[in-house]
């Protein structure tokens, strides 16, 4: 299970322009609904969010290396 602070770190690293308080709260609700999901589910949700909010200049390779740094 990834700790939420690690996920926040990954998001900050990849998406510095959109990490506002509201975005973080929305991500928290999506990643952790009532029950804590499995690692795979967290990763899948996070990956979808990264793709959705990804700024054109950031490539998937950079996101992957960023995630590798925190895992």
Curated annotation (Swiss-Prot):
Induction info: Encoded in an operon with groES, groEL, ydiM, ydiO and ydiP. This operon is heat-inducible.
Keyword set, alphabetical order: Signal
Signal peptide: 1-26
Disruption phenotype: No BsuMI restriction or methylation-related phenotype.
Domain of life: Bacteria
Name the record gives this protein: Uncharacterized protein YdiN
Lineage of origin: Bacteria, Bacillati, Bacillota, Bacilli, Bacillales
Underlying gene: ydiN
């Amino acid at each position: 299970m990834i700790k939420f602070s690690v996920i926040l770190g990954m998001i900050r690293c990849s998406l510095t322009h959109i990490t506002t308080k509201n975005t973080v709260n929305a991500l928290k609700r999506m990643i952790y609904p009532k029950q804590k999901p499995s690692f795979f589910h967290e990763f899948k949700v996070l990956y979808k969010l990264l793709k959705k909010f990804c700024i054109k200049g950031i490539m998937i390779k950079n996101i992957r290396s960023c995630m590798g740094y925190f895992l």
